[in-house]
Amino acid sequence: MSEKLYPVLPEAKKNTLIDNETYLEWYEESVSDPDGFWAKHGRRIDWFKPFTKVKNTDFNGDVTIKWYEDGVTNVSYNCIDRHLKSRGDKVAIIWEGDNPYIDKKITYRELYENVCRMANVLKKHGVKKGDRVTIYLPMIPEAAYAMLACARIGAVHSVVFAGFSPEALAGRIVDCESTFVITADEGVRGGKPVALKENTDTAIDIAAKQYVMVNKVLVVRRTGGKVSWGRGRDLWYHQEVASVEPHCEPEPMNAEDPLFILYTSGSTGKPKGVLHTTGGYLVYASMTHQYVFDYHDGEIYWCTADVGWVTGHSYIVYGPLANGATTLMFEGVPNFPDQGRFWEVVDKHHVNIFYTAPTALRALMGAGDEFVTRSSRSTLRLLGSVGEPINPEAWEWYYNVVGDQKCPIVDTWWQTENGGILITPLPGATDLKPGSATRPFFGVKPVLVDNEGNVQEGVADGNLCISDSWPGQMRTVYGDHKRFIETYFSTYKGMYFSGDGCRRDEDGYYWITGRVDDVLNISGHRLGTAEIESALVSHHSVSEAAVVGYPHPIKGQGIYCYVTLMTGADAQDPDELRKELVQHVRKEIGPIATPDKIQFAPGLPKTRSGKIMRRILRKIAEDEFGALGDTSTLADPGVVDDLIENRQNKK
C-alpha cells in the first residue's frame, strides 16, 4: 500500500470550487441535515413544479427510496432547453470518430433540434411515456440523441453496450419487454466493422421465441454496410427525422418516474435491470460532475467510457449536459491507429479534464512513454480514474508521465447502482494517496462491517456498506423488488451493501480492495461468474464449470475457468476445445467475457453438501496453493492435487 502523500497542488487550490474547509463544512451539513442540504442543492436543476418533500427513504423492510417525490421536471429540458438562451451556440458534444480524421461538433441548438426530431419519430411510431426503448448503438452522437429523446417524451431507455452479443441483447429486450429498438447498420472500432443490425435481427428472433415482439427498429446509417431489412418493421433514421418537426415539448415527469434501466451483472446468472429515476439522479449526476471534476464553464471535458455503461450515462451525457458543459464522445479505442491516440485527441480538442479506466492506463503504460511524450497535453488540468481500483504504479505513471505532475487525479469509486460518484478526492480539497479513493462525497456515509455484521471503527478492513441514501441511488431492480432487497439490503440490515471490500486508514481514507462476492471486475466492467459459468455449461461438451478471477497485469482481473467435460468429450484435442469454448462464451455474452485461462479438470472441489469451494479455486488460479486453508470438509480432497498439478497459471 502506498504511503506517499501528494498535497493539494497550489494551482488546483487557487481556482477551486471546493477547498478543504468548504468540503468539511458541507460534508458535516450533508450528513447531519440531509433534508436541508439536498433541498438547497436540489435547486441546481430546473423544476416545472418545485418539490416540497426532499428525502423519504428507508433501508429496512420493503426498502423505499424517494427523493423530491412531489417535484415535476424533465431531464432532456435540463440538459438542453435551459441552456439555449445563454449557450445556444456553445458546443455541447464534440464527436471524435474511430478514424482520426473524422470529427463533428454539435452545438446546444443543434442538439435541441436533433433530440426533438428523434423524440417526434418515437412518438410517431407509438412510443409513449413509460414504454421501454432499447438502444444498441456505437459511440456516435445519435446514441446521446436517443437517450435524451426518450427522456424528453418520458420513455424509459435501456442502453445495451454495442460489444454485447445477440444473445445478451435479446435477454435485455425480453426482461424489460421492449418493443422498440434503436441500432445502426454497423459500428466501427479500431478500423473494424461491428455487425450491429445483424446482431439486432438475431436478438429479435430470439426474443420472439420468448413471446416478446419488437415492432419497430430505427436504424442509423453509420457505415453504409449492407444490411437485411424487415419490411414494415425497420426504419431508416435519416429518412424518418427528415419528415418530422424539429420541436417537441418536454413531457412533465414526476421526480420518481423512471428515467432508465441499465443491466449489470450480479452474483446469480441473470443480469439485473438497475432502475434509476428522474429528479434525484439528475441532481446527483450534475452535482458530482461539477464538484468532483471541479468543472468551470468553457472547459472541454472528456470521459472515455461508452454510453453502454453507467459511466457513459452519468459522465458523458447527463451530468455534463445538465451543467451546460462541452462533453467529448469518442468512437474509437485507445490503441488505434496506435497507442498515442488518447493524447492526440487531448491535443486536437484542447481537453482540460480527462476521465478514463485503469485498464486503459495499464495497457498504455506497457506500450512505453514515447506515445505520451510526443504529444503536448498542455491543456490538461485534471485527470480521473474510474471502474476499478487503480494500482499505485499506474497512478504514479498517470500523474508523472501523462499529467506532468501538474494535474490532480480524482480516483473515483462508485457503481451502476449508485448513479454517481460516492467516494472520491476533490481536486482543490483533498491530499492524494496513490491507490486510495480517499473520502466520501457529500451525503455519503460509508461504513465498514465485518462478516458478522459488526461495524468497524477507526483503522479497519471490512465489507463496504453505505448507511443512508443519496439522491442518485437506484430505486429497484426492474420488475423484481424482492431481488433488489435480497441483493443489497439483506446481508447487513439497514445498510446498502456494495459487494466490495475496503480498508480505512489512519487518515480516514478509503482503499477499495475489490469484490467480495461472485462478481468479477474485468477492465472496469462487472461480470458475474454465474453468467460465464452458464455460458460454458450451455456447450454440449461441458458438464460443469466454475469461474474465478485472478490478477491480470492489464485488465485488473482475468477470467479463469475450471471445466469438467461430458463423458467422451475428453477425447477431443484440448487446445481446439479451449478455442471452441472461448468462441462459445464470446457468442453467448460478448468479447468482454473472453476467458483468459481454461483448465480441464476431472472434478471440482466440493463440500459434502455439494457446494463448490471457490476459495480453493481462487488460490490455485492465483498460483498461491501453499495457503489453501482447511480442506477437511471436501468430499474428495484428491481433486485438489489434480487442479494444482494442471494449473494454467504456473509462475
UniProtKB/Swiss-Prot annotation:
PTM (free text): Acetylated. Deacetylation by the SIR2-homolog deacetylase activates the enzyme.
Main enzyme class: ligase
Binding-site positions, ATP: G387, E388, P389, D411, T412, W413, W414, Q415, T416, D500, R515, R526
Cofactor entry: Mg(2+)
CDD domains: ACS
Reaction equations catalysed: acetate + ATP + CoA = acetyl-CoA + AMP + diphosphate
Any Pfam family hit: ACAS_N
Keywords: Acetylation, ATP-binding, Ligase, Magnesium, Metal-binding, Nucleotide-binding
Positions with a binding annotation for Mg(2+): V537, H539, V542
Cellular component aspect of the GO annotation: cytosol
Name the UniProt record assigns to this protein: Acetyl-coenzyme A synthetase
UniProt keyword annotation of Acetylation present: yes
HAMAP family, per the entry: Ac_CoA_synth (MF_01123)
PTM-bearing positions, type N6-acetyllysine: K611
EC number(s) recorded for this UniProt protein: 6.2.1.1
Entry's family note: Belongs to the ATP-dependent AMP-binding enzyme family.
Sequence positions that bind CoA: R189, G190, G191, K192, T311, N335, S523, R586
Entry's Gene Ontology molecular function annotations: acetate-CoA ligase activity; AMP binding; ATP binding; metal ion binding
Listed GO biological process terms: acetyl-CoA biosynthetic process from acetate
Function description: Catalyzes the conversion of acetate into acetyl-CoA (AcCoA), an essential intermediate at the junction of anabolic and catabolic pathways. AcsA undergoes a two-step reaction. In the first half reaction, AcsA combines acetate with ATP to form acetyl-adenylate (AcAMP) intermediate. In the second half reaction, it can then transfer the acetyl group from AcAMP to the sulfhydryl group of CoA, forming the product AcCoA.
